[in-house]
């Protein structure tokens, strides 16, 4: 069985940069590793991602949004994550179930039990072995975002504040799985903390 590592954070937190750095490092020391993302880790998922992030001139109900995320996740788990773990790979995923809990429950206000049930259904109960939360203040997140924001990035500041609070609550409730890192630090300093965390857990 492999090892499943997820990276979480609000928009423009720097998690994708850290996944890329860790992926390159693990490859350099001879580890079997893949990197993937949600939404959009599969060909079908890329189409779902386009729908989710595009701006529409018609109502996009929150439940419809949630179901699309979970559809993407189910395909992703069955096609990429589980087969890779079964083959003994380290799997690095840019977002996973904690993003859905933060975005759809804490920020959108959908009932926690609904979100939790659908997360479990889509993943067959598969949880990450380890999750890195790259935490940055909302003001820095919004400053880092480009002018051409997608549908989610374009939400108001209150949405992003609820999102950050949600991620921190999730991490507080599952301290054994989470490593919370100050995302305002130097990129390579963050990378070192991540690598050291893996060494401390005898993953590498």
Swiss-Prot record:
Catalysed reactions listed for this entry: dTMP + ATP = dTDP + ADP
EC number, as in UniProt: 2.7.4.9
Family per similarity comment: Belongs to the thymidylate kinase family.
Protein name: Thymidylate kinase
PANTHER family assigned to the protein according to its UniProt record, in alphabetical order: THYMIDYLATE KINASE, UMP-CMP KINASE 2, MITOCHONDRIAL
Pfam families found in the cross-reference section: Thymidylate_kin
GO cellular component: cytosol
Highest taxon, organism lineage: Bacteria
GO BP field: dTDP biosynthetic process; dTTP biosynthetic process; dUDP biosynthetic process
Function: Phosphorylation of dTMP to form dTDP in both de novo and salvage pathways of dTTP synthesis.
Cysteine disulfide links: none
Matching PROSITE patterns: THYMIDYLATE_KINASE
Example GO molecular function: ATP binding
The entry's keywords: ATP-binding, Kinase, Nucleotide biosynthesis, Nucleotide-binding, Transferase
Binding residue positions for ATP: 9-16
């Amino acid at each position: 069985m492999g090892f499943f590592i997820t990276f979480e954070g609000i928009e423009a937190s720097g998690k994708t940069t850290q996944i890329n750095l860790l992926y390159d490092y693990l490859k350099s020391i001879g580890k079997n590793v893949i990197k993937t993302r949600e939404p959009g880790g599969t060909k079908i998922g890329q189409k779902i991602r386009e729908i989710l992030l595009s701006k529409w001139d018609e109502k996009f109900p929150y439940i419809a949004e949630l179901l699309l995320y979970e559809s993407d996740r189910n395909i992703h788990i069955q096609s990429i994550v589980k087969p890779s773990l079964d083959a003994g790979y380290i799997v690095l995923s840019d977002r996973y179930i904690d993003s859905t809990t933060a975005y759809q429950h804490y920020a959108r206000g959908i009932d926690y039990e609904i979100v939790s049930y659908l997360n479990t259904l889509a993943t067959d109960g598969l949880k990450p072995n380890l999750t890195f939360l790259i935490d940055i203040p909302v003001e820095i997140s919004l400053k880092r975002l480009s002018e051409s924001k997608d549908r989610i990035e374009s939400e108001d500041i209150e949405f992003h504040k609820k999102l950050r609070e949600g991620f921190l609550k999730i991490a507080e409730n599952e301290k054994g799985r989470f490593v919370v890192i100050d995302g305002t630090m130097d990129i390579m300093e963050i990378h070192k903390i991540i690598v050291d965390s893996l060494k401390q857990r005898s993953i590498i």
